[in-house]
Each structure stands twice: as C-alpha cells, then as structure tokens.
Amino acid sequence: MNFENIPEYVNWEDEIPVIQYKALTDTGCVEHGFSTRLGGVSQGIYKSMNLSYTRGDEKGAVDENFRRFCDRLHMDWQKIVSTDQTHTANVRIVTKADEGHGISRPKSFFDIDGQVTDVPGLPLITYHADCVPLFFVDPVKKAIGLTHSGWRGTAARIGRNTVETMQKAYGSRPEDIIAVIGPSVCQNCYEVSEDVARAFMEGFRISDRLVYAKGGGKYQLNLWEANRQIMVDAGIKAEHITVTAWCTACHPDLLWSHRKSGSDRGSLAAFLMLK
C-alpha cells in the first residue's frame, strides 16, 4: 500500500502491524513505530504482542515479541533503552553507555518518563496502554526525544521539558522539531474527577475541547489537545505537529487499554531511533 499522503497509518507488512507517521518518515533520519496487540507470541490475557516484562507474561515470550517487532523496524532489540515510568516529568539524556537498559541488562536509572538522544542506532522506547506517547525529531541537529505523558506528566508539561532538554543538550531549535502525539485515550473515553480536571483549568487555554464538564463532578479530559498546546507553547510550529486519530480505548481489538481491561492486559510501546 502507498502511504505517501496519509499522515497516520497502520503498516501491516509481515503480519506485524505497526502504526507509523508520514511526518516522521519524511525526515529521512529515523526509524519509528507504535505497536498494536497483534503479531506476537504471548498467550492468554497477553495475546499476542505484549511488550512489558512487568505484567506477569513469560519473559521468553516478551523477548520474542521485542525481537519480532524490532526486526520490522530495522532495530536491534537488545540495544533498546527502556524508560522507568512513574508519571514524572523527568527527561534523561541517553548515551551509548545506556544501551540495553531495562531490556538486555538490568535497569540502572529510575523515575524517568522521557528520553532524548543524538546517538544513531540506539532505540528509545516508552510503554503505553492509554497514556500519551510523544515523539520528537530534530532533523537539523539529528536528535530525538520520546516521552510517556499521562495526566500527571501532561499537567507537569513533560513535553516542554523534552523540548528544553533537546535545546540544552543538542542545540535543537523548537521550530525545527517534528512532533507526533501518538495513540492514547481520547477525550470521549477519558472521564476524570474534578481534582484532575482542576489541574488543567489553570495554565491551559480552557475550552470544551480540552476539559468538558459532564456533571456530577465528572469531566472529560483531552490529553491530545493539552499536549498539543504544550508543544506549541514550547515553540514547535503547529504545522509540525501530527495528532493521532487512534484511541486506545475505542479500539480494544487492536490496542491495549487500561481503561478497558484494567490490569489484565499487555502493554503497547512506542519506538524511535536515529538511523
């Protein structure tokens, strides 16, 4: 299939579906993708493409899932640098010394929800099952960032922190950065309490598009719009931002969702690597 004019698409090559983005492919300097729940070897509640070692799945199955998915993306799965996600706004500068962190060797850093690097051939990943993956590519300075942004990370503006870390570490200019807000829970599926909604009523441009009051102290929160605002405020051009159309909770046949399945599920992952 020709994806030349499609901003976001599911590439079904080799029966391992990958969600990809024209804007990132067009930079010519990265490999990237977002996994689905299909194309792996895990069984039971993890069937079939589970990419988490922490959910109770067999390690050998998760290893094979990583190998299969990374082969599709022309990445070495044993070099992956994994986050240690605790819903922070912390961003780490990743170097070659971090190769294999959390995948082929034990974790050595913790409480990290975002990563940046300028090292070619070093795959970054973040884990997801409703929270927002944020991709950042600077094709000028040849630097990348990948971030996990749940409501806490979004309220703390981890997307801005990622851009600022790329500026300081690599001299990136925000106006050069190409960004993607990836598959995650949509506003219609994301009901939150008033205390969570309140965190977004201060400091964001408020509209029904961001926080919609449905009554009874419940609100519908749009993390896609919140992160888009954060990116624009950080200096990324609006035309350089692609926003997903894939809601994890709306598509339980294709994507893992904590809102839909609770803890009885696998995990998705976002992948980004400089060529």
Roles of regions detected by a PLM:
Residues 1-275:
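Active-site microenvironment for binding and transforming phosphate-containing groups
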